[in-house]
From Swiss-Prot:
Pfam annotation, one family: AAR2
Keywords assigned by UniProt, alphabetized: Acetylation, mRNA processing, mRNA splicing, Spliceosome
Subunit structure: Interacts with PRPF8 (via RNase H homology domain). Component of a U5 snRNP complex that contains PRPF8.
CDD domains xrefs: Aar2_C, Aar2_N
Name this protein carries in UniProt: Protein AAR2 homolog
Gene3D superfamilies according to UniProt: 2.60.34.20, Aar2, C-terminal domain-like
Stored PANTHER family: A1 CISTRON SPLICING FACTOR AAR2-RELATED, PROTEIN AAR2 HOMOLOG
GO biological process annotation, one example: spliceosomal tri-snRNP complex assembly
Acetylation is among the record's keywords: yes
N-acetylalanine modifications at: A2
Organism of derivation: Bos taurus (Bovine)
Similarity section: Belongs to the AAR2 family.
GO cellular component terms given for this protein: spliceosomal complex
Function: Component of the U5 snRNP complex that is required for spliceosome assembly and for pre-mRNA splicing.
Length: 384
C-alpha cells in the first residue's frame, strides 16, 4: 500500500481513535481493498489502521502464484467497526479466502498490546474518499448487514452453485426425460434445455428481500389490476409492511447495500435487485405522497450513486432502451403532482435538471407508461 500524506496531528489522533483490521498471512500480490480504495498487497502488509468507526466493505481477489496476471473473482465482506476497535483475521491458504471466524480473545489482546510495533505493517485508511463512501452507505446499518449478507458472510462476485439434481448416471437423465449425453444436439434451445438446473450453495447467496411478481391483490377486478399495474404503490406497501415494518426508510439501506455489492463486489445479481427495487420505488405514485421523506432521501441516494456509473451503462445493448431514463421519467412525472409534498417536488425538479445537464438525458418525451397498458388477467377474472 502506497504511503499517504497526512497531517501529523491528525495522524496521531486517528491512530488512537480509529479502528484497526489486522489480516495475517495474506499473500503478496493479492488485490485488497477497503471501501472505495484498493491496492496490490506487498510482502509487509498486515492490515489497515486509522479506520473511521462504522460500516465498511473489505474486498479482495486472490492471484495465481504461477501466473500473477491471473486474478481470481472478487470476494468481500462487511464489517461494523467500533472506535478504537481491533479485528484480527487471517488468510486461509487452502480456500484462498479470508477466514472470518473470530480470533481467540487472548490473541486479539496480545495483538492490541503490540499495535505500536505492528504499526509499520499497517496501511492508513485513505480519508480522501471517506465522504464518498459515507454518501453511498449512510442508510446501511448493522441490522441491514446482518439481514442481507449471506450466512457465510462472504460476498462473491460469482456464486458457488450446485446442480439441483446430480444426474451422474444415464438412468438419472432418462428419469428427467433428458437425452443421453452423447446424443446430437439439434438446436441452441435444445442445448440450453440439456444444461442441469443449478442453485446457489446453501449459505452463499445474498438474502435480498423478496419482491412481488404480482402487483395487485388477490380478487382484484380488471380495473383494479390495470390501476395497480400502472401505479405500483400496492406492491411497494406490501414489501414495506412485510420486510420493513418498523421503519420504511430501511428499504433505502437495502438499495444502497445492493449497489455497493454490485459496484465494489462485482455481484451482477445485486445490480438486478437494485434495478427491480428502484423500479418499484419510482413507479409508486401514491406511496410518494405517503412517504415523502423516504423519497427525498431516495433522490439524494440516486444523486451519489449515478455519479459512480457511466451514462451509457443502463442502455440495453439489444433494444438500446435506457432502463434508468424510462424509470426516472415516470418518477419525475409523478413528482409533479400537486398532491406531492412541495419539498419533494422541488428536489425532484432540481435532480431532473441536474441529470439532463450532466448526462443529456431527455425526460420530456411522453413516457411509455402513458400508452395503453395491456395487462395479463389471472385465471377466473372476467372482463365483462
Amino acid at each position: 500500500m502506497a504511503a499517504m500524506q497526512m497531517d501529523p496531528e491528525l495522524a496521531r489522533r486517528l491512530f488512537f481513535e480509529g479502528a484497526t483490521v489486522v489480516i495475517l498471512n495474506m499473500p503478496k500480490g493479492t488485490e485488497f481493498g477497503i471501501d472505495y480504495n484498493s491496492w496490490e498487497v506487498g510482502p509487509k502488509f498486515r492490515g489497515v489502521k486509522m479506520i473511521p468507526p462504522g460500516i465498511h466493505f473489505l474486498h479482495y481477489s486472490s492471484v495465481d502464484k504461477a501466473n500473477p496476471r491471473e486474478v481470481g473473482p472478487r470476494m468481500g465482506f462487511f464489517l461494523n467497526l467500533q472506535q478504537r476497535g481491533l479485528k484480527v483475521l487471517r488468510w486461509d491458504a487452502a480456500r484462498e479466502e479470508v477466514d472470518l471466524s473470530p480470533a481467540p480473545e487472548a490473541e486479539v489482546e496480545a495483538m492490541r498490546a503490540n499495535l505500536q510495533e505492528l504499526d509499520q505493517f499497517l496501511g492508513p485508511y485513505p480519508y480522501t474518499t471517506l465522504k464518498k463512501w459515507i454518501s453511498l452507505t449512510n442508510f446501511i446499518s448493522e441490522a441491514t448487514v446482518e439481514k442481507l449478507q449471506p450466512e457465510s458472510r462472504q460476498i462473491c462476485a460469482f456464486s458457488e452453485v450446485l446442480p439441483v439434481l446430480s444426474m451422474r448416471h444415464t438412468k438419472d437423465r432418462v428419469g428427467q426425460n433428458l437425452p443421453r449425453c452423447g446424443a446430437e444436439c439439434k438446436s441452441y434451445q435444445e442445448g440450453l434445455a440439456r444444461l442441469p438446473e443449478m442453485k446457489p450453495r446453501a449459505g452463499t447467496e445474498i438474502r435480498f428481500s423478496e419482491l412481488p411478481t404480482q402487483m395487485f391483490p388477490a380478487g382484484a377486478t380488471p380495473a383494479e389490476i390495470t390501476r395497480h399495474s400502472m401505479d405500483l404503490s400496492y406492491a411497494l406497501e406490501t414489501v414495506l409492511s412485510k420486510q420493513f415494518p418498523c421503519s420504511p426508510q430501511d428499504v433505502l439501506g437495502e438499495l444502497q447495500f445492493a449497489f455497493v455489492c454490485f459496484l465494489l463486489g462485482n455481484v451482477y445479481e445485486a445490480f438486478e435487485h437494485w434495478k427491480r427495487l428502484l423500479n418499484l420505488l419510482c413507479r409508486s405514485e401514491e406511496a410518494m405522497v405517503k412517504h415523502h421523506s423516504l423519497y427525498v432521501n431516495l433522490i439524494s441516494i440516486l444523486y451519489h450513486q449515478l455519479g459512480e456509473i457511466p451514462a451509457d451503462f443502463f442502455v440495453d445493448i439489444v433494444s438500446q432502451d435506457n432502463f434508468l431514463t424510462s424509470t426516472l421519467q415516470v418518477f419525475f412525472s409523478s413528482a409533479r403532482s400537486v398532491a406531492v409534498d412541495a419539498t419533494l417536488r422541488q428536489k425532484a425538479e432540481r435532480f431532473q435538471a441536474h441529470l439532463t445537464k450532466k448526462f443529456r438525458w431527455d425526460f420530456e418525451a411522453e413516457p411509455e407508461d402513458c400508452a395503453p397498458v395491456v395487462v395479463e388477467l389471472p385465471d377466473g377474472v372476467g372482463t365483462g
